[in-house]
Amino acid sequence: MARVLLVEPFHGGSHGAWADGLVVHSRHELVVVSHPAAAWRWRMRGGALTLAEEARRAVAEHGPPDVVVVSGMVDLAGWLGLTRRFLGDPPVVLYLHENQLLYPVSPNQKGSASDELPLVNWMGMAVADQVWCNSAFQRDGLLAALPDLLDRAPDHSHVGFLGEVADRCYVVPVGVDLADVPISKGMVPEEMVPADPAGPLVLWNQRWDHDKNPKAVLDALRHLAAEGVAFRVALVGENERVDPREFVEARDHLGDRVVAWGFQDRAAYVDLLNRSDVVVSAAHHEFFGIAVVEAMAAGCVPVLPTGQSYPELVGSWADGALYPDGDLRTRLHDVLIDLDGWRARVVGLDEAIRRFDWRTVIADYDDRLETLAAGTDRDITSGTTGGPD
């Protein structure tokens, strides 16, 4: 059993769920240092110093780690410099839930995007022994975007280092806590409960942020309501916005069709997963998709865009799960008026998606950590750790 120091600069939401799940399910001894889920830009710019101090106290109490795993919302290069006197030289993994090269800029963000935070990501990748990305979509997009970033350097370009860093990049999906998510009946129409006369229950369960493109979903729902299509809707998920105006307007417009709204505690959320028929997304950005995985595991028929990480999630069920660009309203309409037919197109997806259950993926995490702790898969200078998975 290895001792693993887990550094989570943004302990909340999907980041916090990942860190907590790893601690609960791993066979290794995990020691966690973290900061709350707030001020993410400051975490990336300045969190290294205070996280290094927390790491110093953790090492003094628990002993030096065999492996260090650092979540990506911090300056890893700076953090390693600040911890060099007490940390020793354990292998270091950078885990990327997202990256700032590909993350869409908020329309409310002041000023133009700069290279500062993307370079924090790059320097972290350069100093890590291994880089774990939560999806092939993120890994491949990141590696494709890096040359353009690095080519903008005025001199001493880093482009020559890209190949060896790419060789240390692996796909290691996040685990999802599905133990309490009900196992559906295989989405076989004749086995499902009778249809609700008010129509299928449509679930929106993502963050209420610009990158999830809620406006497209809410507009589609309003149009379908105006056409007289029968449906109910649950508009739930994390919301840190002071004025989620489009959601408030949608709630007022849809009226009694809205059966749940806003953040739900775990018990209420799981109950909602059990009652929902359809999960919908129009996300501009999705490097993995925990909320959608939860809904599909519970038997929801997915109505998802063709891009992002979604093809990777649904695999051979793509024709029944993904809609072409611009066809959200049409696909959602078709699913709502023929729910049983669309259920039949995705039979088996609910079982296949459970490959992301923590109880399944933890073996891969633990084996990777054990190999690193043993020192048999580490060579930061030559990039000989093997190619991407």
Where are these predicted regions, by residue range?
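A charged, aromatic-enriched C-terminal amphipathic alpha-helix characteristic of glycosyltransferases
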Residues: W42-G46, G326-D327, D340-T376
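Donor nucleotide-sugar binding/catalytic pocket of nucleotide-sugar-dependent glycosyltransferases
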Residues: D129-M187
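Conserved donor-binding/catalytic core segment of Leloir-type glycosyltransferases
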Residues: V176, E190-K212, L218-H223, V233-A234
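Nucleotide-activated donor-binding/catalytic signature segment of Leloir-type glycosyltransferases, i.e.
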Residues: R245-A267
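Short alpha-helical donor nucleotide-sugar binding micro-motif in glycosyltransferases
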Residues: D271-S276
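Aromatic "clamp/platform" in nucleotide-sugar-dependent glycosyltransferases that forms part
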Residues: H284
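Short hydrophobic beta-strand element within catalytic cores of glycosyltransferases
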Residues: V301-P305
